[in-house]
Design a protein with these regions (language model features):
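Extended polysaccharide-engagement surfaces of secreted carbohydrate-active enzymes
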Residues: 3-326
Length: 327
């Protein structure tokens, strides 16, 4: 039984959270604040050992090893999979073309930790954080330059100072409604977000519907009494060297460097991922260099300033929104 559990964990959980050789950032805990932490190529050794212990699935391990060693593309022999980990309020959706996950928190689970002087800006990561990756390296070492008020997937006020949870370890969530359903291939996740801690004073009803070639992200009941404008960030990832395309009123344009605001564009295309806005909305788009140091998020790391070219996209709900929505 223990051997079967180990096999299932390694094949259907651990390695599913790695795209190519890069692990999804929101399953790394406070390790996210350490340089090169997402590169898991060294875990090819684990897969080699599992191939000996679990010969029934040797072909799966061979494919995993090939991806980890860059001998094959990130999508090599990946099969559709959808899992909701109800004990952890976490959802993982895998397709050959992409991987997408959602992290939430409830009264049953704990917020992201920031112990030992690590992960010092992590506060909003527990609140509907998402990854969307095709190659796996879309967020590699972006974190010192990240705007941590705009973590992908989250709806959050753009506070001057990012809060720190009440405790560096084991701070329980406050939502009583966070969960999902899955048939192992498709699924739905939902999160009733409400946070009155440290001036956040913001709530939203958030849901994700998972299909083959698309993920539908919906938000409603977005309310806030915070002094700061509330943003729902769709993505904040490394900027691809190809053009960013935007369509508005069916007119396609190429986006230059800078910060921009649009009223109800049709869609945005960046790095092979399309973002469609069926209900419009006030959209912000940033396409520029961002700076920061590893020390800003981890006091054991270097104070040397880092520069990253970053793409950010999301909804601007304004200040004190009442029953705002997004799709």
């Amino acid at each position: 039984i223990r051997d079967r559990l180990l096999s299932k964990f390694m094949r259907q959980t651990y390695y599913q959270a790695i795209r190519g050789k890069y692990m999804l950032f929101d399953v790394l805990g406070r390790g996210i604040s350490r340089k090169d932490i997402t590169d898991k190529s060294a875990t090819a050794l684990f897969a080699e050992r599992m191939a000996v212990l679990d010969p029934e699935h040797i072909e799966e391990y061979k494919a995993i090893i090939a991806r980890l060693k860059d001998e094959q593309a990130a999508d090599y022999k990946l099969k559709p999979l959808h899992t909701h980990y109800f004990r952890g309020d976490y959802t993982l959706h895998v397709r050959p073309g992409y991987t997408f996950d959602v992290r939430t928190v409830s009264t049953r689970t704990m917020r992201c930790e920031y112990g030992n002087g690590e992960n010092l800006k992590t506060y909003f990561m527990s609140d509907g954080c998402t990854n969307i990756v095709t190659q796996g390296n879309e967020y590699t070492n972006i974190f010192p330059a990240w705007n941590w008020r705009r973590i992908p997937g989250t709806t959050a006020p753009q506070l001057d100072t990012i809060p720190m949870a009440a405790s560096d370890w084991q701070t329980r969530g406050t939502s009583t409604f966070a969960g999902g359903v899955s048939d192992s291939i498709y699924g739905v996740s939902a999160y009733a977000y409400m946070d009155n801690y440290a001036g956040v004073n913001t709530g939203a009803k958030k849901a994700w519907f998972f299909f083959d070639n698309e993920v539908v992200c919906l938000g409603s009941g977005i309310n806030s009494t915070s002094y700061a404008p509330v943003y729902t960030t769709i993505n904040q990832c490394l900027l691809d060297d190809k053009n960013i395309l935007l369509s508005q009123n069916k007119q396609q344009t190429t986006i230059k460097k800078g910060e921009f605001s649009y009223d109800s564009p049709d869609w945005v295309l960046h790095n092979g991922i399309g973002y469609i806005f069926p209900q419009g909305g006030r959209i912000f788009l940033c396409n520029q260099q961002q700076t920061g140091s590893w020390y800003d998020i981890n006091h054991t790391e270097s104070k040397e300033m880092q520069q990253r070219e970053v793409f950010t996209l999301g909804f601007n709900h304004g200040t004190n929104p009442r029953n705002a929505t997004y799709a």
